[in-house]
Design a protein with these regions (language model features):
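Donor nucleotide-sugar binding/catalytic pocket of nucleotide-sugar-dependent glycosyltransferases
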Residues: 133-135, 142-178
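Glycosyltransferase donor-sugar binding loop
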Residues: 39-46, 200, 223-235, 250
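Acidic donor-binding loop of glycosyltransferase active sites
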Residues: 259-276, 289
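Nucleotide-activated donor-binding/catalytic signature segment of Leloir-type glycosyltransferases, i.e.
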Residues: 234-252
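Conserved donor-binding/catalytic core segment of Leloir-type glycosyltransferases
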Residues: 5-7, 177, 183-205, 211-214
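Conserved acidic donor-binding segment of nucleotide-sugar-dependent glycosyltransferases
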Residues: 306-316, 324-329
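A charged, aromatic-enriched C-terminal amphipathic alpha-helix characteristic of glycosyltransferases
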Residues: 330-361
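Short alpha-helical segment that forms part of, or immediately flanks, the ligand-binding pocket
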Residues: 258, 281-286, 300-302
Length: 365
């Protein structure tokens, strides 16, 4: 049987970021007896017109893809120009490596507006995936556009996306078998009820709500653990004089992420701009963790959490839910069981991959 040739393309594509890991996981999980997978990526490059710094290539993600039979093809970009609407790549040799005629299908992961170099890829069928909200286009050779939540799809359609091309598939998050190792004994937290969250070091997405709520309910019997987080989280914890709050360095090592999750009783989410489809929330659900979050401009977290917890309006309501989780055992157990069920029925990576494989097969049929 002739293999389906598929190209993945991503600026900074071997970084340890959400969209990057999304594409890396899909590329890695495709059965290599049916698919020939090339992944085009570059290292991070400075932005013109913005002080944003894109995460750079992570050696562990390179090794991850190689170990799963993905052919990595590295190109170069000197700058990314955000002064242009299409965010052009400046001084790139991408076209020396890539020719769309060599592929049956192309998989993208991007923001949603017309972007370089995809504006110049006009023949080969594309499976697009959009990772921000409120932007959309109807490109003729896009076969389907994958959105990651109902809310995001609605905004994408309103911005010009073709509703007949839009499909919803959650983020594929790899959750390998993990042991019960945790930080509980190491931190002396055997008798504590532990809240926690996992977030990248980015002050632009910082929300004060989780720690503000924790300040209301903290005691000698509670703790809060943050994997990653920004300097704002650390400053808030210090300024409030919070008890039993600890921070772990950001990591891409899967065992350490699950060691962190094994330490928690409740996943206490908070992000100023909200979510589309959070990998961190999915990881929490895979550990059967009850969830708390708050309202924000994007509300994908509401769709993800469902009956595994609650999304509240502010820190006072957030604090009340924290108290309920601690003191109402029946409520806690109900949320815990629902978290496990949601993960198995909606977010398990094998069921998500079946949907992507079906899309690719449709393209070439």
């Amino acid at each position: 049987m002739k293999k389906i040739k598929i190209a993945f393309i991503k600026f900074g594509g071997m970084a340890n970021g959400g969209t990057e890991k999304y594409l890396q996981t899909i590329a890695s999980y495709l059965p290599k007896d049916e698919f020939e997978v090339d992944f085009f990526y570059c290292d991070s490059a400075p932005y013109i017109g913005s002080d944003f710094v894109h995460p750079d290539t992570d050696a562990s993600r390179v090794e991850y893809c190689k170990s799963h039979g993905v052919n990595l093809i590295k190109f170069n970009v000197e700058f990314k120009d955000l002064r242009t609407h299409t965010h052009d790549w400046v001084n790139t040799d991408f076209w020396e490596y890539f020719n769309e005629d060599n592929y049956d299908v192309i998989q993208l992961g991007r923001a949603g507006h017309p972007e370089y170099p995809f504006i110049h890829i006009n023949k080969t069928p594309i499976i697009d995936s959009i990772h921000l909200a409120g932007m959309g286009e109807d490109k003729s050779n896009v076969y389907k556009t994958v959105l990651i939540s109902e809310e995001q799809k609605s905004k994408w359609v309103a911005a010009g996306g073709d509703p007949n091309k839009g499909v919803i598939i959650p983020v594929p998050v790899e959750v390998p078998d993990y042991d019960t190792t945790s930080y509980i004994e190491e931190f002396g937290w055997e008798d504590k009820f532990v809240f926690g969250m996992h977030q990248r070091d980015d002050i632009h997405i910082f929300s004060p709500v989780p720690l503000e709520a924790y300040d209301d309910i903290q005691s000698d019997d509670t703790a809060f653990l943050i994997l990653g987080g920004s300097s704002n989280h650390r400053k808030q914890a210090k300024d409030y004089g919070l008890k039993n709050v600890k921070f772990l360095d950001t990591t891409s090592e899967i065992p350490l992420i699950h060691k962190f999750l094994n330490t928690l009783n409740v996943y206490a989410h908070g992000r100023s701009d909200g979510e589309q489809c959070s990998s961190a929330i999915i990881e929490g659900l895979s550990h059967s963790l009850p969830m708390i979050s708050h309202t924000a401009p994007s509300m994908g977290q509401l769709e993800q959490i469902g009956d595994a917890g609650v999304v509240v309006d502010g820190y006072e309501e957030y604090a009340q839910v924290m108290k309920n989780m601690i003191h109402n055992k029946n409520y806690y157990v109900e949320c815990k069981l629902n978290a496990s069920k949601r993960y198995k029925e909606i977010y398990d990576v094998s069921s998500i991959m079946k949907k992507f494989i079906e899309l690719y097969r449709e393209v070439v049929s």
